[in-house]
Amino acid sequence: MIRELEVTDIDEYYMKLLCQLSGKEKEYIWQDMWPFWLRYENNDHHQTFVYEDKGRVIGTASALIEHKFLHYGSSVGHIEDVVVDKHSRLSGVGKGLIEECVEFCKKGKCYKVILDCSKENIPFYESCGFQYSENCMRKDLIDG
């Protein structure tokens, strides 16, 4: 079942799921995450979805809406932090999360939805209706 992230989801399993995306094991403490939750909770232009199976979150993805000066003040949707538990991949979980993010962006009247991904994930996103466009550049500002 896909639904919006709730404060009670941010637990040991959810944080370990995010670690699968970053590739870095880090011990997260709930109290440290509280300021982020408060900032997130009151933002109508950012939504995180989770896929819950048997009471456990096995996938997550976020959608953000950016307002632009271009295109007469319309908006662009961004999809970020897409991850499915390594034991649940290739089961439709990721595709469902992407569809939910795209719907959120449509409701936000976005004229396009964009995302960054690794070369290995291009076929997956193409299967979700995305097409390769341009390049991504990056500059890390914080180590680790």
Model segments located where?
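A short beta-loop-alpha structural element at the N-terminal edge
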Residues: 1-14
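Helix-loop element at the rim of GNAT/NAT acetyltransferase active sites that forms part
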Residues: 15-28
